[in-house]
Amino acid sequence: MSSKFSKIGFILAVAGSAVGLGNAWKFPTLVGQSGGSAFILLYIILTLGVGFVIFLAELSIGKISEKDPVNAYEKLAPSNKKAWSYVGFTMVGAILIVSFYTLVIGWIVKYVFLSITGNLPMDLEVSKAQFGFFISEDFLSQFICFTLVFLCVFYIVSKGVKNGIEKLNVWMMPSLFILLILMLVYAISKDGFIMAVKFLFVPDFSKINTSNVLEALGLAFFSLSLGVGTIITYSASLPDKTNFITSTLNIIFINLLVGLLMGLVVFTFIFEFGYIPNQQGPGLVFISLATLFEKIGVIGCIFGAAFFISLIFAGITSAVSMIEPFTFYLINTFGMSRKKALILIGIVVYILGMLCILSSLKSTQFGFFGMSFFDLLDSVSSKVIMPLGGILAAIFVGFVMKKEALKILFKPYMRGIFFELWYVFLRFISPLAVVIVMIAAFLK
């Protein structure tokens, strides 16, 4: 890359990549339905045992090589360089993800507009019908919103690491926290807040079962943007003498904190109106919450707009991180300018995004293997490419890279028994855990 992050810029950029839309609609619901703080404790343990371990492996690849994923594997492999370089192409998964991710952010833009104009639905059935119409029949709105988000995301990446990605995250991540804190202050005054606290934090170990352990294991891996080259790419711009162990723990903490703050805000309103939090996924936000915000009146419109804007912030910081790995690769390998690289990537992302829209419309509906094109991209990226990329990164660092090179990198920040423990987890425990998640995802 042409420039490096500042120390705080690196933390906020990677945290921005990790903090995504799932923090609002997946993580809080899983916590509440799976044992509250018992699930949180399980999630933290698995994050440190799996996510943290593989995160440091990918960080090591990026920091030592200072290359994009493809060239990083090729540079560091002592033999079979070409074969290992192909592992770097798991960054294609990031391109697939950003194609439908920008579309979902576009949906949120639509709901910001509905909030501001006071046109959110007042009834759950109406809300379901409105959202269903929007994604299955309203091509024009989806096209406009998707295009706006697409242009915004690619403009930010075009500015580079320092002036684009870092500036975005240095501004957007604190803004996200400010919005969440303001919404939390308002939520505290509501009767539903106590129920939300109990739902999220009162431990119920009886709810911990094999299914929940697998869910927590999956979250521990996927919530850190592993397996698609993002961490390798960002770490190539990690400033020297940065305590990356502390930085990684800070990133994990920020990700967890945003999820819990989102959960408190979301479920305060869910419980305030006597709803049952049985939805997980976009429906929780676009159907349940949209209805509740409208019921509150003018304050609800303001609150709804603030909430949806906070989701846009979380989504854009993640989307930006997914474009950078392939951009960096094209610049490194073919000597392209950043502008030309982004035009090529942009064409692919835009076509895939438009296909996602068309595959869900009633008039142009199509799919593969019983799934819409949208769901296919989601499944291929999250169930195949991401876990495969993480497993191969762990194997590469644990069995292919020289241990002495890792010791030198880690020496100022983690040594002795702690380094050896991380190394054992990296070689044997963490990859096996991800294999289990991968198998469980297919069986599900």
Regions found by a protein language model. Give the residues of each.
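Membrane-interface "cap" regions at the ends of multi-pass membrane proteins
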Residues: 1-25, 54-59, 63-88, 239-243, ...
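Inter-helical loop and helix-membrane interface segments of multi-pass membrane transporters/permeases
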Residues: 29-34, 69-89, 102-162, 194-214, ...
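Membrane-embedded translocation segments of transport machinery
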Residues: 2-4, 8, 166, 170-316, ...
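Loop-to-transmembrane helix boundary motifs in multi-pass membrane proteins
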Residues: 2-3, 9-10, 17, 143-144, ...
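Hydrophobic alpha-helical segments and their helix-loop junctions in multi-pass secondary transporters
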Residues: 101-123, 177-200, 268, 352-360, ...
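Transmembrane helix-boundary motif of multi-pass solute transporters/channels
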Residues: 6-46, 232-235, 245-249, 253-256
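Helix-loop-helix connectors at the membrane interface of multi-pass transporters/channels
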Residues: 105-137, 237-241, 246, 250-258, ...
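A generic transmembrane alpha-helix motif of multi-pass inner-membrane proteins
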Residues: 372-396, 415-444
